[in-house]
From Swiss-Prot:
GO cellular component, one term: cytosol
Name of the molecule in the record: Modulator of apoptosis 1
Entry text on domains: The protein is evolutionarily related to retrotransposon Gag proteins: it contains the capsid (CA)subdomain of gag. The BH3-like domain is required for association with BAX and for mediating apoptosis. The three BH domains (BH1, BH2, and BH3) of BAX are all required for mediating protein-protein interaction.
Cell compartment(s), UniProt: Cytoplasm, Cytosol; Mitochondrion outer membrane; Extracellular vesicle membrane
Organism, as annotated: Macaca fascicularis (Crab-eating macaque)
The family this protein is said to belong to: Belongs to the PNMA family.
Length: 351
């Protein structure tokens, strides 16, 4: 329904739906400034964009916003969701048609060589005859041009068809259809080396193979660094799921990881999360206790010991999940920054 809304909204504004995003799940009380702030943080990898309009959806009791892009973008760069006021906002995107992309590149190359697709087809078929590579039936005059065309179109061909990676979730034991970490990592590393595509496409294919806890780890890292590379993703997975630390040493490291003096609380939580997921993977923390374990360590390791009160978290209430906690902290940090800015303005006014 939301993709159809994106297409209809763009059609009404006479714009290309592939140059737009629909942001859904926005709180009814969220202001334009708060929407802009969330977009600035969540859509940074996309470059220039513009908030075009907002709409209230009665069936969800939430707002949606239309965002315009300056150009079509890669599916790998568009986040599926971004943190915003009141919770997580969904990002709806109409990806480019890979077949059209390939044909566009082919036509662009041929136009530069003064050829048409029909002429290229006849050259490959050797004037409508059968193509016999063993007998060297490609005309000598076309050979260099065809080689150049294949080289130029290799990235597009790689994107159109590729062998998907095996599935890894980090669960123990692996579920049917999933690989254990060592075998998965070896296979994935070899495949990624062989792909001749941009890093963003490699990262998209990597994320496509992840499930469960493994996918959660990379999502956490992407929140902190939207431009994280494939190598950095693999390194993080190695640190969490590779056999390195014993559970006791890991638990000590987790419990002695504290917020640094100049470090934001949200950055501390993001730094802490891979260690927590590793403890869960080793069986040192039960999965149903992970939210409470996270909250306990954040409160214990935070510079300001009143953080539970600042976040309005009751002593006897259930611990929030990771994304919910991060949203609470982001709102708290935004309020603190706004208060500090106001104080600075007031001090400048009265001095």
């Amino acid at each position: 329904m939301t993709l159809r809304l994106l297409e209809d909204w763009c059609r009404g504004m006479d714009m290309n739906p592939r140059k737009a995003l629909l942001i859904a799940g926005i709180s009814q009380s969220c202001s334009v400034a708060e929407i802009e702030e969330a977009l600035q943080a969540g859509l940074a990898p996309l470059g220039e964009y513009r908030l075009l309009g907002r709409m209230f959806r009665r069936d969800e009791n939430r707002k949606v916003a239309l965002v315009g892009l300056t150009a079509e973008t890669s599916h790998a760069l568009v986040p599926k969701e971004i943190p915003g006021k009141g919770g997580i906002w969904r990002v709806i995107f109409k990806p480019p048609d890979s077949d059209n992309t390939f044909l566009s590149r082919l036509n662009e190359f041929l136009a530069g060589e003064g050829m048409t697709v029909g002429e290229l087809t006849r050259a490959l078929a050797h004037e409508n005859g059968s193509l016999d590579l063993e007998q060297g039936m490609i005309p000598e005059m076309w050979a260099p041009m065809l080689a150049q065309a294949l080289e130029a179109l290799q990235p597009a061909l790689q994107c159109l068809k590729y062998k998907k990676l095996r599935v890894f979730s980090g669960r123990e034991p692996p579920e049917p259809g999933e690989e254990e970490f060592g075998r998965w990592m070896f296979h994935t590393t070899q495949m990624i080396k062989a792909w001749q595509v941009p890093d963003v496409e490699k990262r998209r294919r990597l994320l496509e193979s992840l499930r469960g806890p493994a996918l959660d780890v990379i999502r956490v890292l992407k929140i902190n660094n939207p431009l994280i590379t494939v190598d950095e993703c693999l390194q993080a997975l190695e640190e969490v799921f590779g056999v390195t630390d014993n559970p006791r040493e890991l638990q000590v490291k987790y419990l002695t990881t504290y917020q640094k003096d100049e470090e934001k609380l949200s950055a501390y939580v993001l730094r802490l999360e891979p260690l927590l997921q590793k403890l869960v993977q080793r069986g040192a923390i039960e999965r149903d206790a992970v939210n409470q374990a996270r909250l306990d360590q954040v409160i214990a390791g935070a510079v300001h010991k009143t953080i539970r009160r600042e976040l309005n978290l009751p002593e006897d209430g259930p611990a929030p999940g990771f994304l919910q906690l991060l949203v609470l902290i982001k709102d708290y940090e935004a309020a603190e920054e706004e208060e500090a800015l106001l104080q600075e303005v007031l001090e400048g006014h009265f001095t």
